[in-house]
Amino acid sequence: MKKNRWQPTILAFAFWLPASTFASNDLYGPLRSYAQSPMQVVSHTNHLRSGFSLPSEYIEAYGSATIASVWAHTDEYALDYYHNQLEIGAKWQVSSQWQWELNYRWVFAADNHLDGLTESFHDLFGIGQNGRDKVDKNRFYISMPQYDVLEDGFEGQTIANNLSTYVQYQILQNERHGLSLGGSLYYNKVAHGTFKGSNFEQGVQLNYSYLYGAHAFYSMFGMTFRSDDRALLDLPYRHNTAAMAGGDR
């Protein structure tokens, strides 16, 4: 008999709302988060997962909302905009060794009014603004003269629109240790607007977790493979990238 649960996550505030009835062992794993840097948010990025499986035939549904303020300013480029992410998905523990996941993620440009909050945070802790206070607030602006890129006023447009699937095989699992290997397929297609385009990517990752008392340690090493060497307005991007992550609960 399949058992279902819903796992909402609001990543913008690092706030997790679990159902307490499933708090035993490692049913939740690490807080789910997706990289929000300009290049990573529009491509496949491996993220931290539990090395343990769910109980057989469990189905876990999840959803998240993330808001981000992008600011990067050098002599070569300037990025100043907001992006927002909505994500839904579900995992199914098909058997004791196999898990399958389906995920949809939408990233779009919209005014989330973070500029003022960010400047206040920098002032509070004595962090320099790096020019943020010299330009208008709430802009949507990307300039990279080296690559003939100049985009302004793209508020309301889709930045990424992707569907991905993930299959995981349980290599080892006992009371303390969990080791699993997973592979991902990722397809992104933006039909129109400034960020129009499509890309197909693949990923593989090794997940290891260790339980000790009420705590858990999580780690991940992964690789992403791309047929295209461009991302985000056709900017150069590596065909293959590696990622490592660790966490404690």
Task: List each model region and its residues.
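Bacterial N-terminal signal peptides that target proteins for export
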Residues: K2-I10
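Bacterial N-terminal signal peptides
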Residues: I10-P18
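Transmembrane beta-barrel domains of Gram-negative outer membranes and organellar outer membranes
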Residues: A23-T194, N199-S219, M223-R226, A242, ...
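A beta-strand-loop signature enriched in Asp, Gly, Thr, and Trp
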Residues: L232-G246
